[in-house]
């Protein structure tokens, strides 16, 4: 029996959106993505205790300063979890920069270089890592610098066409346009509470971005993220990559309904437009209330979970 997950793999690179090693072993994705929230939930799993202990020992060996130890411990823990995942996935791990640096280009660049150095020291080459950065103007500028250094980036918390366009123009390796969080916003801010997959505003957003990239010949990979239901995933079959949580991977694996490719650009490739200026980026992005609210909220939520992780690590330092 061919499952929907099997069919999806034939047209889209399937990525696991989790830090749970057991789930990754079960569904055998090509890549895996983590974020501060997933690192926090993974850290509560008993099999991760040795990784936390090792990160604490590493941090204590680096510095006698408690504040610095905390920074080093959280960076090392994120990398330790990534290293475990890389033992299973054949492709790449996405490890996220501290969300509190989202509006600081230089600090983002420095944090990314540090994470890469930790992976490199463990014998992992750059081509197996994506550095995840929020799609702020400052984050996109940081990614532009990093890409030129051979450090590939995954630009996340992407909700607007302006963000997508600026990422492509910066030569970013991959973007993660969010689907489910867009749907959440429309449900909360309109009278319409139910959406068929094809009319789901998150699905429409990713479809537009995918077609725009293909129409203008951008090489940036489109990886749909943040799904609320299987319908959103099947409606984006054919997208370059999709990063999917274990619960939805399970649903796809248990369903054998035929899957039809939905995304495939067959038109001609046009000349690229002039890159957006900073002023144009902010005008276009800020014209989309959903994108403004969801980007800010996403950064806040990741920062809260980063702080919870710090509280847990502080108790051990």
Curated annotation (Swiss-Prot):
CDD domains referenced in this protein's UniProt entry, alphabetically: Transaldolase_TalAB
Function: Transaldolase is important for the balance of metabolites in the pentose-phosphate pathway.
Active site, per annotation: 132 (schiff-base intermediate with substrate)
Protein name (record): Transaldolase
A Pfam family reported for this protein in Swiss-Prot or TrEMBL: TAL_FSA
Organism: Haemophilus influenzae (strain PittGG)
Compartment(s) where it occurs, according to its Swiss-Prot or TrEMBL record: Cytoplasm
Gene Ontology molecular function, alphabetical: transaldolase activity
KW Transferase (keyword) present: yes
UniProt record, GO biological process: carbohydrate metabolic process; pentose-phosphate shunt
Superkingdom of the organism of origin: Bacteria
Subunit text: Homodimer.
Keyword Transferase: yes
Annotated keywords: Cytoplasm, Pentose shunt, Schiff base, Transferase
Enzyme Commission no: 2.2.1.2
Biochemical pathway: Carbohydrate degradation; pentose phosphate pathway; D-glyceraldehyde 3-phosphate and beta-D-fructose 6-phosphate from D-ribose 5-phosphate and D-xylulose 5-phosphate (non-oxidative stage): step 2/3
Major localization listed first in the record, in broad terms: cytoplasm
Gene this chain is encoded by: tal
Reaction equations catalysed: D-sedoheptulose 7-phosphate + D-glyceraldehyde 3-phosphate = D-erythrose 4-phosphate + beta-D-fructose 6-phosphate
SUPFAM superfamilies given in the database record: Aldolase
GO terms under cellular component: cytosol
Family per similarity comment: Belongs to the transaldolase family. Type 1 subfamily.
